[in-house]
């Protein structure tokens, strides 16, 4: 059994309420069933599964060869708001006995139905861990309130899209308990191949129907605006009658307003109309084939904006029920849908088209990820949830440990030459610092980092410093969410696709944050330096290379692929010198320490570097500092090179001002003081007048990389953790 602290099988209770959530839960249930060494599965069926009017869909669960442990009749008929509330109450009355009998370790709940809210409430109050499937999504209806309420009750979260993951993080959920897996139903969608799909089409729509020459309609009531929902459904049916294509109409969900929608169908004779087939339920594997080969789908079901995109089938999304969801280009929104002509026009626009397949909601590998996630759950961990609230300015909870100890962070700086580890206090004081040469191989480097951090952590105890976590600054591109170095600079070898968080966290039993050196410098300025209290500013680091970080509205910008603030690679000349990145004309190719060293060597080789009062020992490499010294002593060529370098940096700053319009630019690093006056001159000459009042200053921080690494940890301690 995988390492998770458990010495027995995990008892998993899957509770399903209707046909839609079963389509998402079934792939997970099949996956659990295939691993009996790890899991025991109990299935609880309730809600509309057990209602004859909605097809008694519990039978399809039995046909899938699942043993239904418990059937709970929880639906109070009436299909109005009061009936929904009474149904939740009835479920809350019945569920405690079931859960006491089953004693599950974890309950899996899907989506945003009122039945699911009852399940999550019961499990939470009975101290049963909850895994919520498809949290974090936004539709634009009352479903959002229910979904987000379940999120607050749930201990673990499986989401389908990156934006849903970000919503969960914004809701202060613990990132370590969020899995971006994709939609489980996509595992079946993307592997569904049925050469005999025509027999399915004929079975549901008639023998004379051709592929791509029919419509699937699926519309549900919006419970916060039932009257408008009924009117829109009536207009939709009128438009479909007028469009005169064979149409499969599925009955709506058993929500408030559904009874009135069924009355509209019967009033218009839909169940007996030659062009319509009205059905209560279609098995999911057959439904997949029907929507995959339809001329279009119309309605307001989430299926239209989620699953159908996998086939590129045209979709007409009516009203506001799915207004907040991500959609592919196959979806045409008719948000008002207040006239028959408008809906009819949408049908003419969409019917029969074929769009590119969309995989916004999954890649077909959700279930393996979910099973791995389940196996990682440690039942010995405290049940109480932790919420990660945003920083609270200067508002740290006090206890006796806080008073007697110095709250501190371990900061790690991985440079091209040196590896440094420091104990940094809450006030930004470097209490103790360790420096070693950075090894050339991955194994030696990881080993040395661990050794130095363990040594520093032990020393922190002697110094009465309470270490709250580890922050790491490294060159290259970093995924800070995962703590992984994606691509490193050429100065640090064997440092691509490196997981830094896991080995340090496992060894030190502390939380670990990782970011690149440019971002760390910006965070150091935000917490300890001249950026403190500034809403928008940019930091430029002038060292061996050129880096930077951008703070916008007090937050660090990482970019969609963690490549924001590569300021050294802003191009300032079309025919400039080659850059280490493979391009040419970059700021770094002019103004970095490497660039100045290159120019210094050229002058030295031509005997044009040294002037009176200068000497370079034979065993000493010529570098940027020699060029600066020569310029100070009157070397005109050295002065010209520095002027060109400073101008290139200044042009880069002008581009930043025109793009970001920050109120402050901080120049950091050993070359900053040599460039600042030139940069200010370029701004006066080249920048728009509206941005020329920007403050450009030299950083007064001695170790921005270490302080920035520490700030990731120390900022975290100002959050409330419950």
UniProtKB/Swiss-Prot annotation:
Pathway: Amino-sugar metabolism; N-acetylneuraminate biosynthesis. Phosphorylated. Phosphorylation by PKC activates the UDP-N-acetylglucosamine 2-epimerase activity. Bifunctional enzyme that possesses both UDP-N-acetylglucosamine 2-epimerase and N-acetylmannosamine kinase activities, and serves as the initiator of the biosynthetic pathway leading to the production of N-acetylneuraminic acid (NeuAc), a critical precursor in the synthesis of sialic acids. By catalyzing this pivotal and rate-limiting step in sialic acid biosynthesis, this enzyme assumes a pivotal role in governing the regulation of cell surface sialylation, playing a role in embryonic angiogenesis. It holds the Pfam family Epimerase_2. An N-acyl-D-mannosamine binds at residues 476-477, 489, 516-517, 566, 569, 588. Mg(2+) binds at residue 413. This is Bifunctional UDP-N-acetylglucosamine 2-epimerase/N-acetylmannosamine kinase. The gene is Gne. Keywords: Allosteric enzyme, ATP-binding, Cytoplasm, Hydrolase, Kinase, Magnesium, Metal-binding, Multifunctional enzyme, Nucleotide-binding, Phosphoprotein, Transferase, Zinc. Its EC number is 3.2.1.183, 2.7.1.60. The keyword Transferase applies. The keyword Acyltransferase does not apply. It comes from Mus musculus. Zn(2+) binds at residues 569, 579, 581, 586. One of its GO terms (molecular function) is UDP-N-acetylglucosamine 2-epimerase activity.
């Amino acid at each position: 059994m995988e390492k998770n602290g458990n010495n027995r099988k995990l008892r998993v209770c899957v509770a399903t309420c209707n046909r839609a959530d079963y389509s998402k839960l079934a792939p997970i249930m099949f996956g659990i069933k295939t691993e009996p060494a790890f899991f025991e599965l109990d299935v609880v069926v309730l809600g509309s599964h057990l209602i004859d009017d909605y097809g008694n869909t519990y039978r399809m669960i039995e046909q899938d060869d699942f043993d239904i442990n418990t059937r709970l009749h929880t639906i109070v008929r009436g299909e109005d708001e009061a009936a929904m509330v009474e149904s939740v109450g009835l479920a809350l009355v019945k569920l405690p006995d079931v859960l006491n009998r089953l004693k599950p370790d974890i309950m899996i709940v899907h989506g945003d139905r009122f039945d699911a809210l009852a399940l999550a409430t019961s499990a939470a109050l009975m101290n049963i861990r909850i895994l919520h499937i498809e949290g974090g999504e936004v539709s634009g209806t009352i479903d959002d309130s229910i979904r987000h309420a379940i999120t607050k009750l749930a201990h673990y979260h499986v989401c389908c899209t990156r934006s849903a993951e970000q919503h969960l993080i914004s809701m202060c959920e613990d990132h370590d308990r969020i899995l971006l897996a994709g939609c489980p139903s996509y595992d079946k969608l993307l592997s569904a191949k049925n050469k005999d799909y025509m027999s399915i089409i004929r079975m549901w729509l008639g023998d004379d129907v051709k592929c791509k020459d029919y419509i699937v309609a699926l519309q549900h009531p919006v419970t916060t605006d039932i009257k408008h929902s009924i009117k829109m459904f009536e207009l939709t049916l009128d438009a479909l009658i007028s469009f005169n294509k064979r149409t499969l109409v599925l009955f709506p969900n058993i929500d408030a307003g559904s009874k009135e929608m069924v009355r509209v169908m019967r009033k218009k004779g839909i169940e007996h109309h030659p062009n319509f087939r009205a059905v209560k339920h279609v098995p999911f594997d057959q439904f997949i084939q029907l929507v995959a080969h339809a001329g279009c789908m119309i309605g307001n079901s989430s299926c239209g904006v989620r699953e159908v995109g996998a086939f590129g089938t045209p979709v007409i999304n009516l009203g506001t029920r799915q207004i907040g969801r991500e959609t592919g280009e196959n979806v045409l929104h008719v948000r008002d849908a207040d006239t028959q002509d408008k809906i009819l026009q949408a049908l003419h626009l969409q019917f029969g088209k074929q769009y590119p397949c969309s995989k916004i909601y999954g890649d077909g590998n959700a279930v393996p990820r979910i099973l791995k996630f389940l196996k990682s759950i440690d039942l010995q961990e405290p049940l109480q949830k932790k919420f990660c609230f945003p920083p609270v300015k200067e508002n740290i909870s006090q206890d006796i440990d806080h008073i007697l100890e110095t709250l501190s962070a371990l900061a790690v700086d991985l440079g091209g030459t040196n590896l440094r580890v420091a104990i940094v206090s809450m006030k930004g004081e470097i209490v103790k610092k360790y420096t070693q040469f950075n090894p050339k191989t991955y194994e030696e480097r990881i080993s040395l980092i661990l050794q130095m951090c363990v040594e520093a952590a032990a020393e922190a105890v002697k110094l009465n410093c309470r270490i709250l976590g580890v922050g790491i600054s490294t060159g290259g591109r970093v995924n800070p969410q995962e703590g992984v170095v994606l691509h490193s600079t050429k100065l640090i070898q064997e440092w691509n696709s490196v997981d830094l968080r896991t080995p340090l966290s496992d060894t030190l039993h502390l939380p670990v944050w990782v970011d690149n050196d440019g971002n760390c410098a910006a965070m150091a300025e935000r917490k300890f330096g001249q950026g403190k209290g500034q809403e928008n500013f940019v930091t430029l680091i002038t060292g061996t290379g050129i880096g930077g970080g951008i703070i916008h509205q007090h937050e660090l910008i990482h970019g969609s692929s963690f490549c924001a603030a590569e300021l050294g690679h802003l191009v300032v000349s079309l025919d400039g010198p080659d850059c280490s990145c493979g391009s040419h004309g970059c700021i770094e190719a002019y103004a970095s320490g490497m660039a100045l060293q290159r120019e210094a060597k050229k002058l030295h080789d031509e005997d044009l570097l040294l002037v009176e009062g200068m000497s370079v020992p034979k065993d000493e490499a010529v570098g940027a500092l020699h060029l600066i010294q020569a310029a100070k002593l009157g070397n005109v060529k050295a002065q010209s090179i520095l002027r060109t370098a400073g101008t290139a940096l200044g042009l880069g700053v002008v581009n930043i001002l025109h793009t970001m319009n920050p109120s402050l630019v901080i120049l950091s690093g050993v070359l900053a003081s040599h460039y600042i006056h030139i940069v200010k001159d370029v701004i006066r000459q080249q920048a728009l007048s509206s941005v020329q009042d920007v403050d450009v200053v030299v950083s007064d921080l001695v170790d921005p990389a270490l302080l920035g690494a520490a700030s990731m940890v120390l900022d975290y301690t100002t959050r409330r953790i419950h």
